[in-house]
UniProtKB/Swiss-Prot annotation:
GO terms for cellular component: cytosol. The lineage of its organism: Bacteria, Pseudomonadati, Campylobacterota, Epsilonproteobacteria, Campylobacterales. Sn-glycerol 3-phosphate binds at residues 79, 107, 109, 161, 214, 224-226. This is Glycerol-3-phosphate dehydrogenase [NAD(P)+]. It comes from Wolinella succinogenes (strain ATCC 29543 / DSM 1740 / CCUG 13145 / JCM 31913 / LMG 7466 / NCTC 11488 / FDC 602W). Keywords: Cytoplasm, Lipid biosynthesis, Lipid metabolism, NAD, NADP, Nucleotide-binding, Oxidoreductase, Phospholipid biosynthesis, Phospholipid metabolism. Catalyzes the reduction of the glycolytic intermediate dihydroxyacetone phosphate (DHAP) to sn-glycerol 3-phosphate (G3P), the key precursor for phospholipid synthesis. The active site is at residue 161. Its EC number is 1.1.1.94. Belongs to the NAD-dependent glycerol-3-phosphate dehydrogenase family. It comes from the Bacteria.
Length: 297
């Protein structure tokens, strides 16, 4: 077996179908699915590498239970910042595995389009570029892959853009227009970069596929769960209602809280994340966006 994918959600299933074109693949999932080759975790460890496509909030618990051998190679396909500790996904993983065996998938990609075989370009970030290059060989030709070593930058982009996507959904849901939306997304990119640079990320990462590419995609389409969270909030729905309708995890909710905590602790200016978190805690969306778009913020 070439690749074993951990997690049978939308993203894990899409990656399974894509990788199957060129590689032998199995899926480790709690629920059985017709037409999908599934295996146990023990069997998955025989693969060349694992693709981790579980919710970032479940990552630490899964790693504690899995007890992976140190030689395990992982391509991480989940995005987020741990609430409470403020740890990036890479920081959590490096508590369990050597960093030279870890790589991180980033870039603009909706699961639905990947599942349909539509072309896209992604980035594999890793401290060990040879590992990233090796993993890229198992993807089909219609997924263009680049390799980069800015792990922190790739992670911050992947996590933060979900928060900006919620703001984008709110902006569109309130009918504030294209001018306001462009301002919000552009400022969101600057805010992401400022946060990432504080932790040593490269500015170039935020201008490429992992940053601007993923942000522009996610903040303007109903294919984005986080964007739909924002739309729902603007329409007056409760967060509980929205999550029931989604039926899936929207990582931006917990990430907004984590970023706000880190920004307050470290003195980082993060007004969009702050307002999104306030809205998620019950603040009026219209009032929040008015505050954000007015002079002085």
């Amino acid at each position: 077996m070439d690749v074993a994918i951990i997690g049978g959600g939308a993203w894990g299933s899409a990656l399974y179908k894509a990788l199957l074109e060129k590689s032998s693949v199995a899926l480790v999932s709690r629920s059985g699915r017709e037409g999908i080759h599934q295996c146990s975790l023990q069997e998955a460890l025989e693969a060349r590498f694992l693709v981790l496509a579980i919710a970032s909030s479940a990552l630490r618990g899964w790693l504690n239970e899995a007890n992976l051998p140190p030689k395990t190679k992982i391509l991480v396909a989940c995005k987020g910042i741990e609430e409470g500790s403020g740890a990036l996904v890479s920081e959590i993983l490096e508590e369990f595995l050597p960093r030279e065996n870890l790589a991180y998938l980033a870039g603009p990609s909706f699961a639905k389009e990947v599942r349909e075989g539509l072309p896209c370009a992604l980035v594999i970030h890793s401290h060990h570029l040879e590992l990233a290059q090796e993993m890229s060989q198992f993807f089909p030709s219609w997924i263009r892959l680049y390799v980069e070593n800015d792990v922190v930058g790739g992670e911050v982009c992947g996590a933060y853009k979900n928060v900006i996507a919620i703001a984008g959904g709110i902006c569109d849901g309130l009918g504030l227009g294209y001018n306001a939306k462009a301002s919000l997304v552009a400022r969101g990119l600057v805010e992401m970069a400022r946060f990432g640079q504080y932790f040593g990320a490269k500015i170039e990462t935020f201008l490429g596929l992992s940053g601007a590419g993923d942000l522009f995609l996610t903040s303007g389409s109903t294919l984005s769960r986080n964007y739909r969270v924002g739309l729902g909030l603007a329409q007056g729905k409760s967060l509980e209602e929205i999550l029931i309708e989604l039926g899936e995890v929207a990582e931006g909710i917990k990430t907004a809280r984590a970023i706000t905590q880190i920004a307050q602790r470290e003195g980082i200016h993060a007004p969009i994340a702050h307002e999104v978190n306030a809205i998620l805690q019950g603040k009026n969306p219209k009032e929040s966006l008015k505050d954000l778009l007015s002079h002085g913020r």
